[in-house]
Amino acid sequence: MGINIDKIKTNVKKYLDEKRYRHVERVAAAAKELAEIYNVPAEDAVAAAYLHDVAKFFEIRKMIDLVRGKYPEVENKISQTTAILHGFAGAEFIRNNYDMFGIDNEEILDAVKYHTIGSENMSTLSKIIYLADAIEAGRTWDGVEKARELAKKDLDK
């Protein structure tokens, strides 16, 4: 049985405001496009994209409780900012709520976990989510157009 994207969308929407949900939709569109270019299952990329910010608005205490003892190599750093912590907390929240999201694929969970900071030896899916988050259509930073073009040619540049 495949991933139920509609179920993921419905449940993710419960945790995000409208502005953040629109961002997630744009990330999903960018991730799907990149997945098709790099021969990654589009379903995995879309699922990871919809899930990547699920913990964005969790209270800091909840985020810390979700990750405590699981990531000692980054635990001191991640507790300092929700911008980093929400990826790790989101991965654990998804893992702990299989009934809600239907995801236990470690590659998808890693893509959620590392979407803000990256990691060594990232999978192609993780690179796609990392980049899709940065280059989605709502982003307007200097150089984003060039980054969008480059992402379609090489995920490692």
Where do the language-model regions lie?
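Non-catalytic interface/linker regions that flank or bridge core catalytic/transmembrane domains
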Residues: 1-2
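Divalent metal-dependent catalytic cores for phosphoryl transfer on phosphate-bearing substrates
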Residues: 9-15, 34-156
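N-terminal glycine-rich anion-binding loops that anchor highly charged ligand groups
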Residues: 23
